[in-house]
Amino acid sequence: MRVFLSAYGNFYLAIPITYISSIMLYSGNSDKKIEHNSENHNTYISLPILFDYTGETPRHGIILRNNMNDENNGIIKNKTILLTTEIEHEINIPEERIYSMPKILDKIKISRVFSGILFEPDRQDKNMFLFLNPEVLIQNLQKELE
């Protein structure tokens, strides 16, 4: 599975490339978890605020595909954009190394947005990778807004 990695404290957030339309530099200041732009109808989700890393500044915007066969991915209107810390790496991780999230974490609401976990004990800095499922993230946030 090819993913982009962004650092959050002591873990990497892994975002599968299959969900991504494109990436942009982000220099704005977001102080809300979710913001909707009424001009272009884009929805911005601040992952540092969502994950309670308010000291982290979003450096990139990850523009999600509207669906897997999205023909208009070059147009940045009516999109969901994940604001994230700097994307540090793009790597390929064999799917057989990724474990499903432990059931005990189901009690923690935020853990439901992750599709898997990987531990790399040989890494000195960040040895845990959490794999984001953007579809579940968006569904959960839409429920909050209703």
List PLM regions with ranges:
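An acidic, low-aromatic, low-complexity terminal/linker signal
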Residues: M1-E146
